[in-house]
Structures are given as C-alpha cells and as structure tokens.
Amino acid sequence: MAGQFKSAFAVSVSIIAMGVALPAHAQDSGAGAEPAADTGGINEIIVTSQRREENLQDVPISVSAFTADQVLARGITDVGRLEGIVPGFTFGRSGQDARPSIRGVRTENVGVNGDTTIGFFIDGVYQSRATQATAGFVDVERVEVQRGPQGTLYGRNTFGGNIAITTAQPVLGEILGGLDVTVGEYGRFRTDAFVNLPVSDTLAVRVAGSLEKSDGWVKNVNPLGNNLFDDDSKYLRATVLWEPNDQFSAAIKFDYSTRGGAGGSAFGYKIIGSYFDVGSRQQLYNGTPVLNLNTRGGNRDGVNDALPGGPATSDLGVPVFAPGDGYTIDTDQKTILDLENKAITANLAYDFGGITLRSITGYTDFGAIRTQDSDFSGNQIAIDYQDTRAETFSQEIQLLSSDTASRLDWVVGAYYFHDELTGVFINQQLPRIIRNVTPNLNLAQNGGGFYDEQRATTESVAFYGQATYEVVDNLRVTAGIRWTEDTKDFAFANANAVLPTSGTPAVPQGTAITLNTGPIPDSAFGAQGAATNCTYTTFPPPRPGFQCLAANTAVLTGATYDTAKFRKATWRLAVDYDVTPDNLLYASVSTGFRSGGFNSGQGPAALQPTFDPEEVTAYEIGSKNRFFDNTVQLNLAAFYNRYNGLQEQRQVPQGGTTLSIIENSGRARAYGGEAELLWRPVTGLEIGANVAYLNAKYTEYDQVPAPFGTSILVTDATQTTPTIVNGVQIAAAGQRRVFAPGYDCGLIPGTGGTGQPAAAFGCDISGNSIPHSPDWTGAVFAGYDIDLGSLGTLTPFAIMTFSSSFFGQPFNSVLEQQPSFQKVDLRLTWAPTDYISVQGFVNNVTDERTINRFVWGGGGALQASFAPPRQWGALLSIRF
C-alpha cells in the first residue's frame, strides 16, 4: 500500500509541476475581475465550498461548478446529467433514489436505517433522503460538486463529497423573467418559467415553476402493466428577498413539488440473470423441494395441471422475461409513484463590519409512496409497496470574518438537525405459484405477505470552526475542526399474514391478497411508548393493483427498539500557495464520517447490533491555473483516501435460516488523479476535456456471504469421493467448497453437507474493486458561436463522455460488470437575439445501453436499472 501511495503521488506531483511550469501571463483573478473579452477569456465562477463566496480558482479544494448558462447550454437537467461532465463522478439510480459515487465512495443503503454518503444541499440546507436528489433543476444559479470528504464545514454524511445546488435569488430593482419549453421523444413536454418582481427598493420576489409530462422510456409489453420512468411532475418556488440596508439581508424561500406516474420501480426494474444454473437448484414449493426447470422461468409449482391461459398439461417453456433490450419489460402490475415535498428555507445575514452573522434555517416535509412488481414477470405473483415519510428541521448559525484586508479568514458555527422518519414496506404474494416465476423464488401454495414498519429519529448537534492565515505573502495555512453528536432512536415491528389453510388453494387463484388489519400497536415498539405517527388504518391505503381479502389476519412476529449516540470529531489541515496570481498550489489532509445506525429484522437482540460510523482520511494535492491571458484553465488534483469501518451487509445463521444485518466489517483505499481543462482561444470558441483515474479496492473485506444467504455449496464434506465438475476436480473427498455469485470462495472448513447454508462461512474478497468505481472516466467537449450577422448566432455543441468497465457489486462477478462505454450528446442552438434561443438536442446519440445499478434480489436473481436510452428533443428559451 505504501508503495502505491508513493507512486501515485509522485506521478501526480510531476503532472502538477509541469502544469505550473507553463508560461503564465499574470492577471488579477480576485473578485470583480473581468474576462478578457477581446481574446475570449474565461469567466470566473463564484462558489461557496468554504461557506463563503470565493472565486473557484482561489479555493484549495477539488470542486467543479456550473453557472445557470452552462446548465442550460449543456443540458444539465438533473444530478444524473453530471455523470462524465464532472471528473470521477458516476451516477447510479434505483427507482427514484440517487446513488452517486465519488472516489470509491457510493451510496448503497437508502433505507430508514441508513444515511447517504454523498451530501446533497439546496441553498445550504442538507436533504436527508436520497430521493430528493433526483428532482429536476429549476431556475438554478449554480451547481457545485465537491470531491472528497467535507466533514469540517459541512459535517455528517459528506463522507465522499457534496452536491450543492444554489437556486436563483431575487434581484432588487429589476423586472426579469424567463420561459423554457421542452418537447421531445416519449411524449415529453416540459415548461419552466420564472419571474422576478421588485416590490420596493428594498424588497423583491422571484417565483419559479415547472411542469413536466412524459410517457416513460421503459416499455411494458404487458397490457396489464405500465411503462416505467414516465414523468408527471410539478414544482413551484417563491423566494422573497429583503435588504433594508447594506448590512442586513433576508431571503425566505417556499417550495412545493410533486412527482407522480409509474416511477422507476423500487430497486431494479429488470432481472438480467441468475448467478447459478437454476435448472439444477432445488426450490421450495409449499415447503416441498422441487427443481427449477428453465433458466428463463419455467414450471416451478411442481404440479402438472391446467392453468388459465396455459398449456393443458404443462406450463414449462413459456418465457417470463420480455425479449429484447434493457428498456423492455413484461410485468402485469401497474406500478405507482406518489411523491410530495414541501420546504421552507430562511437565509439571514448581518454584516457588523468585518464580521458577518449568518443564519440558515430549513424545514422539509417529505413523503413518497412507491410500488413495484416484485416477481418481475407477467404473472400475478407478488408486489411490493413502500411508504416513506420524513419531517426534517435544521438550524445553522455562522459567524465569519468579512475583512478583506486582514491576513486571517475564519468561520465558526453551530448546527442542529432533527429528522423524524417512518418507513412502511409491504409484500404480498398471491395464492399458488403459476407458470414462469422469477428464478429461485420460494412461495407457499396459499400465498402470503408481510408488513414491516420502521420509525427512526435522528437528532444531531455540531460545533465547528475553520481559519485560514496568510503566513507570508501568497502562502496560507488552513486548520479546521468539527465535533458532531448524533442521537438516534430506532423502532421496528414486523407482522406476517396468517392465511386460511383449507382447500387447494384456500382462496381462488389470481386473487390479490395483502394484510388487512389495523396499525401495529404502539406497544410493539417497546420503550418508544405511545406514538402519534402510526396513522394507517388499512395496509396499504387503497391503490390500483391491491385488493384486500377479508379472511386474512396478521400476527406480530418481531419487534425491536434501540437508542444510541455517535460522537465524532472531524478535521482538516491545508496549505496553499500562489505561485503567480493565476497559479495556485495546495495540499490538504481531511477526515469525514458517515453516521452509525441500527439493524432491523426478526431475531434476538444479540443479532441486531448497532453499527458505528464509517470513517475516511483523505490526502490531496492539487493545482489551479489560468494561462495565456486567461484563455486556458487547467485544474489538477491527486488524492489518496483510507476508509475504515465500512458499513457492509452480512448474513448470519439464525434458527435454520439467515438474517441480513449491517456490520462495520471492512477497510478500503482509493487513490487517483483528476484533471479539468478549458480553452477559449477566441471569442465564441470553447474546447474542454476532463479525465479521472481511480484505483479503488477493498483491503479488508472477509466473511462476506452471497446475497441474502444464498451461497451455493457445491461440495459435500460428508462424501467419500472427490467432487468432479465438467471433468475437473474442485474438491477432494471430505472437503467442501463454496461459490458465491460468479465468485469462487474457495475451500471452507467444517463438516456440513450440501444442504447446509454457506452464509455462516462466507468469502474473503479483499482486493476486489469497489462497486461503481471505474478506473477511467472523462469527457471531451467543444462549442462554437457562429456569427450570422443580423440573424444572430448559431452554436453547435458536442460532448463525448467515456467510462472504463466497472463492477456493480463487491463480488466482482462477470454478471455484475458494466463494460466500458462512450456516450455522445449533440446540441445545436440558434439565438436570433440576446433574449430568444431555440435548441435541438440528441442525448446518447449512439444509444449506448448501460447499467447504472445492480442489486441481488431474493433467490439469487440479479436485478438491474439501465441509464436512459437515446432521446431527442427541442428547447425554446425566452428571457426578458
């Protein structure tokens, strides 16, 4: 490891030194500097990465930033569109949940008992749910992506970095407005609008809104189902700015949004395979072992009988999964998305003269209902229902220096965060298995169902400070520290359906069933006592695709309650030096953490331990440069990160089965480099490129079982002869060998037979690549404003993004691998005046079909979510 560390940094230092050695023509890059318009110079971008407004090129942190004009011109409509444009940033998605990845850090657990690893902030307010990060951008002023832990100034759950959105603020004394209308493939129609109105010399209001409709780009060939990734969203925001004098300002923002339609399923939306030959693996039908007969879903009910719409004697051989590509499914259930978000934000500031007091207050009321066809087939077998409710309040107070003549810049602050979260998950299975079941799905003859309810409360308090001192001219030293205490309460209860057992089956085949009972009593949540947020009266609330069966009853089968405190100090040390006014060198070491939490599930308390925070120590060196009269910008960074206490899922044996829990069971390291180049040689011409190299590996990750306890034990320690597979001896007599999904776990000690679960033994996968961490990513882009004289300007713009191959899960099997790919976006914009433009665009011109999320489902079926296919459209923009 030490050798890799030294080699990586040696290469990076050489690159950075070469960059600084290029001839530089000094130009003031401080606030207020004007671009060199006669040579097509590069405009400066103001960012708030250090909680104060600064020129991007003066900030000793790896950060990419985009202005409102760049967001519009490059089609950055949401966080997912940043992939490739931001070096080293990859974007995964399951349904409506964002799963971004930066420098080997990814968001995996998005449940009630989990926190994100990449922070998401809107106007300085932390957004606690991963779903909130997938909303479209509306009237934004700036988008920033900070790479590396931001544990000092931003705090908890900025383990891998930050995504910070700044919305457009009201402007005093001006009437402004805009309208954007987008039409496109899949019936897309979107309207964005804003208006800025001055009420008086000291008061202004800005209102922005958006409406979007589309038909969905994942086609369902089943007439009973619906297309996925359609859109039915509405957004409204109103911001009031009051500046009665030069010292005080107050910006109060109200926003409301909804998203409806079918959504994108809850986890993955398509099964792409299984990690073993399902034709040779036993499954259980009503407790009786039977064999799978078809790798694409054959007869799994073990009964030769006539089924409605099926063959007279057998249901073998009818395909389950829709033929074709990743954008075609065959599911019978109409999935649902019903999301609502209400928020109030207040940003207040008062300048005392050399010191500024700032207050940032945020309140969010979030709710999301989602369903999915959990058998992923065209048969009425199983459906999932999720209902998540979150109410969040945060208050931050900052005191920061504002004396530009001083050698010392400092900021101190206090932060309070309170989050109340309730999650309901319901699974229902229809009576009796019918043909073409999902691979390896165990079902009972009379169907079944279960209901899980989780309640989590998080209260976080933090105090922080950071100071930068200019020791001598152009040389600055920065030190910062943050202390955080998280108090978490967690309650879990589970109820299983108890169905009548008479008859074969007891209820008519094809009847949808679910739990039909009152809420789980508050007493089930132990020490939590009486609660007021358990308001459901039926499970689930009436929705299409769900029917209630009056004969059902429910029995409480498990309950857990726990509380814990997690305390952590994070810090940052840095030094930066201006070689010239346009060339900055910096080096830093910083730490970050992701908060700990609780496990949930059935079983004794001993198997439901809390898990501690994940921790990271990050080393970084970098350089930010402007050359050739402000026409070339080159930013470089190299990093080495150590991750400890990784929160990873593990299966443990319990009562003849296995339980899935989260433990701090791993370590990892990531090193690499990033480069961003922008060249504007003449007015109107822009050429750019970025590239990132990443080597992210697990250094300690043992006893990891196959997903959901379904490791394949292919040898029997009780047999007296060697085990031969395809003519090759894989185990001697008396040995057993375990295979996980596409991964040979090797020989495992013990005496069990073939039927014994291997989850108690697991695999050592140290040295495997961290999921969603391609070695190489980057982009090349170019645009040119062609002067048409009285007809305005015509601007072609093209960008090609690329990624090397990567794995989607820790086992690194070939089934989980996304091959390398390139994607091309094209845009052509005609602007007859400064106030009107028309843009035609094609995203993903070559229709590359890439997977951005892999997840192992029950029974070893691999589910996947694909990135959007090729899409074309047109955009009309009007400004006044």
Protein language model features and the residues they cover:
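N-terminal Sec signal peptide and the immediately downstream disordered periplasmic leader
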Residues: 2-74, 80-85, 246-247, 344, ...
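Acidic, small-polar-rich N-terminal luminal/periplasmic segments of exported/outer-membrane proteins
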Residues: 40-172, 621
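Gram-negative outer-membrane beta-barrel transporters
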Residues: 30-32, 477, 640-642, 663-810
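Periplasmic-side early beta-strands and strand-to-turn transitions of outer-membrane beta-barrels
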Residues: 164, 173-174, 180-182, 198-293, ...
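Outer-membrane beta-barrel translocator/receptor signature
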Residues: 115-117, 129, 138-141, 147, ...
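C-terminal beta-signal and adjacent terminal beta-strands/loops
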Residues: 799-811, 815, 829-880
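Membrane-embedded beta-barrel scaffold of Gram-negative outer-membrane proteins
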Residues: 347, 351-352, 358-362, 367-372, ...
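Solvent-exposed loop segments that connect transmembrane elements
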Residues: 218-229, 264-330, 374-382, 424-453, ...
